[in-house]
Amino acid sequence: MKNMKKWALAAALAIAATPAMAGSALQEILSEGVLKVGTTGDWNPMTMKDPATNSYKGYDIDVMTELAKDLGVEVEFVATDWKTLVSGVTSGKYHMTGSASISPKRAKAAGYSISYFSLATVPLTLTKNADRFREWTDLDKADVTVAATLGTTHESQVKEFFPNAKHKIVEAPARDFQEVLSMRADASITSNVEAKKLVQKYPQLMIVPVSKPKAPTPIAMLLPQADQVWINYVNTWISLKKERGFFDKIGAKWNLL
């Protein structure tokens, strides 16, 4: 582990010392000694914020803390929400984000790291609706309201998957599943990762037993689109950490494997 840290820091310093690389976020991170990471704090088990302490925990938090350690800097988690996740990167509010699903819309404005995890979309409903909703088609009806959260990939998916249903788009800090719990929506869609945690926390919720999840999607970190130096460094770090089992270890810790 010590050798890994020494390698990462040495590589970062060597790259950042190159005159052509002076404008990179990597140079700024090393000069200021701080890696700024945008995170929403509302995606269990990836990123969860404790309002009492303003501290974060989760899969993403562990990953970003490790990246900062290998860079030899401190990590600062910057609060953001889904609708401003990309703009926080493009405006320089933070150097990168935690996990975000890869989408062409986001890629028009921001860059991505290579992927290190995948997820898919599933619907949630109340357990009392078990007989009513069994498949995707059961939700695509005019008398059904399906919720999603503004700024997430699920916002567009809910319209794509359920063209005949009513759509309820909520804005953070409100969340789509809360609309189901309060019975303002019949169902919501979210990642299979979050759905698993939500049904554990709220026994009145259930995952609709669809034959197959939709939209399998790779997960990656959002980065400044034009900063190839920083993107290259992060990609190198991810590749090395994957080979050495780091992502498997963190995935197991948060029950993602």
Question: Can you annotate each of these PLM segments?
Answer:
Residues 26, 56-60, 107-119, 207-211, ...:
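A structural signal for short loop-to-beta-strand junctions that line the ligand-binding cleft
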